[in-house]
Amino acid sequence: MKTKSKVLFGMGVCLMAMACQQNAGQKTTLSGLDPMKFQTEVNGKSTQLFTLKNANGMEVCITNFGGRIVSIMVPDKNGKMEDVVLGFDSIADYINKPSDFGAAIGRYANRIQKGRFVLDGDTVKLPTNNFGHCLHGGPKGWQYQVYEGKQLNDSTVYLTMQSPDGDNQFPGNVTAHVTYTLKSNNSIDIKYDATTDKKTVINMTNHSYFNLSGNPKNAITDNVLYINADSITPVDSTFMTTGEMLSLNGNSMDFRNAKPISEGLDMNNQQIKFGKGIDHNYVLNTKGDINKLAAKLVCPSTGISLEVYTNEPGIQVYTGNFLDGTTTGKHGIVYNQRTAVCMETQHYPDSPNKPQWPSVILAPGQTYQSHCIFKFGVEK
């Protein structure tokens, strides 16, 4: 969910090369990434690139800067390995070109209206960074911070975020974890958990930008999309949810019967006009069942498919509306409009101000848990 955010990126970043001797001879990854370009320091914390592999030859690269998925290599219908996510070649690029590419978003994914909500009678005031609202935790959200990273084995990396009380003005000392596991069935299993010492709100997600053609020069409008949802939470002109549920019956944004994305981009639809495309929270029919299909995307040229499963009540689908050709990503490729799709599993936007929606409040003694699976396959 990327918009023309006026992100004030005043991180005071200190970059310092760390030529770790044990990695001096490390080769590039299958996706062509140089791990040395991810070894540095940001605000005094070390960053690196973790590489996960399975027996099928699939490879996933993750950096602890923002908990980001940097590359995903999967086979197409002819057995050719393709990188199916957008991203950058180095930590320097992630810092100098602020974006949400591949990030583990926190504390609160999506928007909080006017950066304010009331918790136990006290008004919490957050920094705003998007049309007067707080988006993805604010201008210094976790996507711009360094997680502590530990690779447990060839297929799992475990990330930890220690977020102090007052981090981006959110209350409570929060300890959060993100566990990425590459499974033998070519799925990426993402588990989030968090605890706090003071009542707070939390809503985490992964913000990968998918292009299943393996070439971000190609638009995603011919990709066939299915979403298991009867309604969306509509937005106003500032992309803020209105608090309503909008039925998708007779709406171009209805993907209960799989169809090309282009067929959902009816510019006469007011919701599409607001976002210059789809950038909406779909209310899932899965009722928190991780075994039920939430969404599916298929690229006709490569045959690569992506299935999404989650225990969350919603999924934000974003069709790359504000990719505008001003950002150059991995391997020098320019990212133009509609060259990626995001599938962000989540609680609904602005839930702290919408008591009628599932709660995002986390209290001491409780554990926040969220689960998402990205499963890749091939359709010939």
Predicted regions and their residues:
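Bacterial N-terminal signal peptides that target proteins for export
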Residues: M1-F9
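C-terminal motif of bacterial Sec signal peptides marking the signal peptidase cleavage site
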Residues: A17-A19
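An exposed, glycine/acidic-rich loop-and-rim segment of catalytic or binding clefts
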Residues: Q21-M58, N64-K380
